[in-house]
């Protein structure tokens, strides 16, 4: 079981890491350009910027390429079992999907009246993952690596990982709130 958990986490790193990169490189022009939706509330808010989105996707792809190099050097063959073009496309879709899922989560939170940085269980912990998996699953090589068992395990472990890592970041004064 531990092997399956570790493999699942390894496969999901390209969608677990983009939001961290987005925070590091973010800022600048909001994706919604400051516009409001028909309900009068901001579409996404100031926390979702073009630089953060692009930087997050690039960070996820960078993470995946580091994984690929580690696999090649160590003899491990998970992502590196795919031809490079399939690996690259798949991991790009995972990273893009994670960032797009985060935008979807922000949109939903704004509609329900949640402010930037406020806690909204399930949306905060799973939206990025579900959208990433949905988008990536449309690309056939996804199914060479992602079994139903891995997808189910991902949905189960991601909220706990998300909350645990955020709590650690909070305790290290890297985040203002523990969620």
UniProtKB/Swiss-Prot annotation:
Pathway: Membrane lipid metabolism; glycerophospholipid metabolism. It is an enzyme of class 2 (transferase). Its cofactor is Mg(2+). Its main location: membrane. One of its GO terms (molecular function) is CDP-2,3-bis-(O-geranylgeranyl)-sn-glycerol synthase activity. It catalyses: 2,3-bis-O-(geranylgeranyl)-sn-glycerol 1-phosphate + CTP + H(+) = CDP-2,3-bis-O-(geranylgeranyl)-sn-glycerol + diphosphate. InterPro entries: CarS (IPR032690), CarS_archaea (IPR002726). One of its GO terms (cellular component) is plasma membrane. Signal peptide: none annotated. It is found in: Cell membrane. The chain crosses the membrane at residues 53-73, 88-108, 120-140, 145-165. It is a multi-pass membrane protein. Its EC number is 2.7.7.67. GO terms for biological process: glycerophospholipid biosynthetic process. Pfam families: CarS-like. Keywords: Cell membrane, Lipid biosynthesis, Lipid metabolism, Magnesium, Membrane, Phospholipid biosynthesis, Phospholipid metabolism, Transferase, Transmembrane, Transmembrane helix. It comes from the Archaea. Catalyzes the formation of CDP-2,3-bis-(O-geranylgeranyl)-sn-glycerol (CDP-archaeol) from 2,3-bis-(O-geranylgeranyl)-sn-glycerol 1-phosphate (DGGGP) and CTP. This reaction is the third ether-bond-formation step in the biosynthesis of archaeal membrane lipids. Can use CTP or dCTP, but not ATP, GTP or TTP. Belongs to the CDP-archaeol synthase family. This is CDP-archaeol synthase. It comes from Archaeoglobus fulgidus (strain ATCC 49558 / DSM 4304 / JCM 9628 / NBRC 100126 / VC-16).
């Amino acid at each position: 079981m531990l092997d399956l958990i570790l493999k699942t986490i390894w496969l999901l790193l390209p969608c677990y890491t983009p939001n961290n990169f987005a925070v590091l490189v973010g800022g600048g022009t909001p994706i919604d350009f400051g516009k409001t939706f028909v309900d009068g509330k901001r579409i996404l808010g100031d926390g979702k910027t073009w630089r953060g989105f692009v930087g997050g996707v690039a960070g996820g792809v960078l993470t995946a390429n580091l994984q690929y190099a580690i696999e090649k050097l160590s003899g491990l063959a998970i992502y590196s079992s795919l031809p490079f073009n399939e690996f690259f496309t798949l991991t790009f879709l995972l990273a893009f999907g994670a960032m797009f899922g985060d935008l979807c989560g922000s949109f939903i939170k704004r509609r329900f009246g949640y402010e930037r940085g406020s806690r909204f269980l399930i949306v905060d912990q799973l939206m990025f993952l579900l959208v990433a998996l949905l988008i990536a699953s449309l690309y056939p090589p996804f199914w060479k690596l992602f079994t139903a068992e891995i997808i189910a395990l991902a949905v189960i472990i991601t909220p706990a990982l998300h909350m645990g890592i955020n709590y650690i970041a909070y305790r290290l004064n890297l985040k203002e709130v523990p969620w």
